[in-house]
Amino acid sequence: MPTTYFHNPRCSKSRAALALLQARGVEPQLVAYLEQPPSIAELGTLLRQLGMTDARALMRQGEAEYKELGLDNPALPQEALIAALAAHPRLIERPIFIHGERAVIGRPPERVLELL
């Protein structure tokens, strides 16, 4: 079954979760999402795979960009939130491990093992 990993090599949690997968023989396709941001369509699929209905659940709400862009406004439609994630990939929570049709955010890193 294909596996994909949205990875930020500068993030300790991302490195730790990847090491857990590799220790179990899993070599996922790595996506450097900061350099290659997912499209709006890909983000929609990712939200479904994560079982999320609110794009804010995928956002790093502590990032300065979150407030600067007004993403804390509860009146914003989901489409606007997803577009913001595509345009500002630093806002995407990480790491994300995709195994088949399911995905999980690796926080704590051990969560990635739930899909194996």
Walk through the language-model features, giving the residues of each:
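Local sequence-structure signature of Cys/Sec-based thiol-disulfide redox active-site neighborhoods
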Residues: 1-20, 28-33
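Thiol/selenol-based redox catalytic cores and closely related redox-interacting motifs
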Residues: 33-116
